């Protein structure tokens, strides 16, 4: 409940900051995100229920029901279709909703930073007072990003970890090089392929969206330094010391989003992560094939 309040406050703060800098929030992104949250679990469910037959459903029912659930003959698939809704939907829906929410918040924050940079190039007249307002507004952005980190860094860690685990499992199950001694059952081929693509896209979208926020904060620091040089050049010498104190007082480092502090989201994370998963999967397949 507390985390829900934090997210609500975060959404309100992002909206207010966007309004202050005239940042545009495309509502199409919100509608598209809502469609993704609904569509992904439904597709995952359909890829299984449309490809299973009665004997396979009976085996699944024994597995999930611990041999304690018995239904009349010919009704195993109908019961499993109903049961899979409660098995699949909570996990897939939660992971998808977390990833979509995180990506949207990162994109909105990036848009705010872009408008902040654009406004910095148009500051006029450029004096100590306007420069101070510019620095104070960045502090507000910094606080919102800190709130984003505090509220969603742990959920996004679980989501990204889940994505990596699914990529690893699906890569081994699909066995693109024919190394596995236990080929994937044909009933799960469509589901495994879909899960692999969804997990990969989720990992890429989360990483790229989060890293774009860090890139914009680095650009913001460069703009602030350029503005400082311009203000110093047009300021009388007695006021320069006060200006430097102002800059140091309101100075904030570039902000990098993390997954609960375990790793930072940068574009350089993508290739090592995917390469490590692929290498380890091939190693396991090679060992199993011997």
Segment roles from a protein language model:
Residues 112-116, 244-247:
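Short, Φ-rich (hydrophobic/aromatic) sequence segments
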